[in-house]
Design a protein with these regions (language model features):
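P-loop NTPase catalytic nucleotide-binding module
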Residues: 1-3, 21-22, 90-169
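P-loop NTPase switch module centered on the Walker A-proximal segment
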Residues: 1-88, 94, 143
């Protein structure tokens, strides 16, 4: 299983009303994994361009493959990117692919954020994960969202910039 990049893109499309129902990677019903081979393999093998408008600003999301067998897709996407969102699977922590992607972003001096996904799994320890991120990537790691609850008690997050908490339905 991947970190959830395609699922994140699908959720953004759903929240912004571009689609009426969220697709599912395992069912082959997502917007960005439309290639027959991607549907068969149940993971991304090509980069998909997903344009989304937010507050009169057009954001072009490039949903890239997570497996580094397809590193060429990631490198090509970074050539046209102004910034990046690294999606991290909270259940797996910092993986080799995360470190390689970070290195590519460092080489290109691209700004980035890390989106921590799968926080709702029962065995996630946010404090341990944050420590691991800081050990791997140093002072560039600064959380701007902190979870409300951990493990089975995860309910939402607090945005530390505006000090607003959001609890999931």
């Amino acid at each position: 299983r991947g970190s959830g990049k395609t699922t994140l893109v699908e959720s953004i499309l759903y929240v912004k009303d571009y689609i009426k129902r969220k697709g599912d990677v395992e069912n082959g019903t997502t917007v960005s994994d439309f290639d027959k081979e991607e549907i068969r393999r149940i993971f991304s093998i090509n980069t998909s361009l997903i344009p989304v408008e937010h507050n009169d600003i057009k954001l072009n999301f490039l949903d890239t493959p997570g497996y580094f067998d397809f590193i060429g897709e990631v490198v090509s996407a970074l050539r046209v990117s102004a910034s990046a969102v690294l999606v991290l699977d909270a259940t797996a922590g910092v993986e080799v692919g995360t470190e390689k992607a970070w290195k590519l972003l460092e080489e290109r001096k691209l700004p980035r954020i890390i989106f921590v996904n799968k926080m709702d799994k029962g065995y996630v320890n946010y404090t341990k994960l944050l420590t691991e991120l800081k050990e791997k990537f140093g002072k560039k790691i600064a959380p701007f969202c902190i979870p409300i609850g951990e493990k089975d008690e995860f309910k939402g997050f607090v945005n530390v910039v505006d000090m607003v908490g959001r609890v999931f339905d």
